Amino acid sequence: MVSQLLFPLFPPFPALTGPAPSSTIETIKLPKNTGGHSPPSVLQRSLPRENKRIVVKIGTSTLAHPSGLLNIRRVEELCRVLSDLKNAGHEIILVSSGAIGMGAGKLALPHRPEDTPTTQAAAAVGQCELMYTYDKAFAEYNHTVAQILLTAADVDHPDRFQNFHNTMRRLLDLKALPIINENDTVATEEMGIGDNDTLAAVVAVSMEADLLILLSDIDGLYTADPHTHPEATLIAEIPALTREIWELAGGSGSSLGTGGMSTKLQAADICTQAGCDMVIANGSSPSVLYDIADGKPVGSRFRGKKG
């Protein structure tokens, strides 16, 4: 049954597996909240390689103006920087939110839709605009993009997830730049992955990425919510996700998106358990990706478990 393939959000303090086994494969069990009807999904990731493959996730609030319409200048800069990183030898995978927000803006909706039919209609309109913009922008630098839309069932079903993995590997072999989003046109709240922070972490682990970068409208993880506590300070290095770190997660995200700091910490938990580093950084200037790729201290870096 479809209800047994759900991929809901994690509890506030995810109980993932303990220390990695001594073999060359790390196994991560993603906890479910399905009432015990189905076993947790399992992802496998080889031990870390050289720092080459990078997954970049950009959120709706970073892609769009407050009106919901696409921030064309920012998208063009993002595509220029990612193209340059590819030219430098990095393998880039982009997880892009924005379909619903873009569609809401193009349809002149007064706010992000709340009912399912309007949400899915906005996603259908917005995904077209989003991919058209990406395709045109990356073509300026002679890079070919590929669209991949996923649902929770694709992630949970072993055969479908293996097909996704095989396709992704072939796309990277062909030097294409995969652009991934949740398939919001068919996904519902009950059947969806929930947010692209989680999706990006699943992609990063399954594709054996060396680094996941979450570009947001905030500089990183703070000692308190900087929107309401101006005295809050940025935490540059997080070696472990302690209970104190989890308690720093504030409320939900912006009015345009679905992800807040709690979803970013959940993404960090998935990545770090698998040995993959993750960085939260402000995406208002995509050129910050250069410094992050070079290992410079930008935003908040969560260190992956090694060994």
Task: Please state what every model-predicted region is.
Residues 1-2, 188:
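Short intrinsically disordered, low-complexity coil segments enriched in acidic
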Residues 7, 25-33, 38-144, 148-307:
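C-terminal catalytic "cap/lid" subdomain
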Residues 7-13:
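Aromatic (phenylalanine/tyrosine) cluster motif
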